[in-house]
């Protein structure tokens, strides 16, 4: 038990002293996950609302496929992106493998179905009434989508925050496409996995505490929005 207590003490020292290595990892993690979430949300929210309020022949099949994609393992997404960005892959000429850009691409593809599914479910259940009111006022399809975004902005923000929590907590995809390179592609989750295998518990605990605080902050935001 002593080494655990020592690990926590050393972890707090690393955080309080603003250790450059720790905070480089933290900032990169937040940047990659935030960018990936923003890209996924920008595409999935309008698309999810459009699909939710529209009636088309294969809507039931679309729902089943979408909800299945929401649970795709992160390592599968990472593998697909790595193959696509490898030297012999179709996008190999871009030389993006083992860069933060590759990590953003992988995370965006990973969380896109989640944000799309949450938005689709929300708009399917609550968007019809808003659509009816909008059409009564003479709004077109695009105007209806904008109206739904405005009326359901709190719920949509919760969806985005949930998507971000999925992005920042995953390890498989970023490990594969990023390579966990020190000072370049090393993020919180990949660092914790590596440090644990090396027996460097103080640094692992420090990063674990940061990830835990981010998780608590996300849950606090979601709870406060749901209470409003």
UniProtKB/Swiss-Prot annotation:
Membrane-spanning parts: 25-45, 65-85, 102-122, 144-164, 203-223
A single GO cellular-component term from the record reads: plasma membrane
The processes (GO biological process) annotated in the record are: transmembrane transport
Looking at the record, the residues that make up the ABC transmembrane type-1 domain are 26-222
Q: Which InterPro entries match?
A: ABC_perm_TupB-like, MetI-like, MetI-like_sf
Key words of the record? Cell membrane, Membrane, Transmembrane, Transmembrane helix, Transport
Question: Is Transmembrane there in the keyword field?
Answer: yes
Instruction: Indicate how the chain sits in the lipid bilayer.
Output: Multi-pass membrane protein
Subcellular location(s) of the protein: Cell membrane
Q: Which Pfam families match?
A: BPD_transp_1
Q: How does it assemble?
A: The complex is composed of two ATP-binding proteins (TupC), two transmembrane proteins (TupB) and a solute-binding protein (TupA).
What role does it play? Part of an ABC transporter complex involved in tungstate uptake. Probably responsible for the translocation of the substrate across the membrane.
Q: Which family does it belong to?
A: Belongs to the binding-protein-dependent transport system permease family.
Protein name, as recorded: Tungstate uptake system permease protein TupB
Which species expresses this protein natively? Peptoclostridium acidaminophilum
């Amino acid at each position: 038990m002593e080494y655990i207590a020592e690990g926590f003490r050393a972890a707090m020292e690393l955080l309080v002293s603003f250790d450059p290595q720790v905070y480089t990892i933290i900032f990169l993690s937040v940047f990659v996950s935030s960018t990936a979430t923003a890209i996924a949300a920008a595409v999935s929210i309008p698309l999810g609302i459009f699909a939710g309020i529209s009636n088309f022949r294969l809507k039931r099949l679309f729902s089943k496929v979408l909800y299945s994609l929401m649970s795709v393992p992160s390592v599968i997404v990472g593998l697909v992106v790595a193959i696509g960005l490898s030297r012999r892959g179709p996008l190999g000429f871009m030389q993006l493998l083992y860069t933060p850009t590759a990590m953003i691409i992988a995370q965006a593809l990973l969380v896109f179905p989640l944000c799309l599914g949450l938005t689709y479910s929300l708009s399917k259940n609550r968007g019809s009434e808003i659509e009816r009111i909008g059409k009564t006022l003479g709004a077109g399809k695009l105007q209806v989508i904008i109206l739904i975004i405005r009326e359901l902005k709190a719920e949509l923000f919760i969806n985005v925050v949930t998507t971000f929590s999925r992005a920042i907590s995953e390890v498989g995809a970023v490990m594969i496409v990023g390579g966990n390179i020190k000072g370049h592609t090393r993020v919180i989750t990949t660092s914790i996995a590596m440090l644990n295998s090396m027996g460097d518990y103080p640094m692992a605990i420090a990063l674990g505490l940061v990830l835990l605080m981010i998780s608590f902050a996300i849950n606090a935001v979601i709870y406060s929005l749901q209470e409003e």
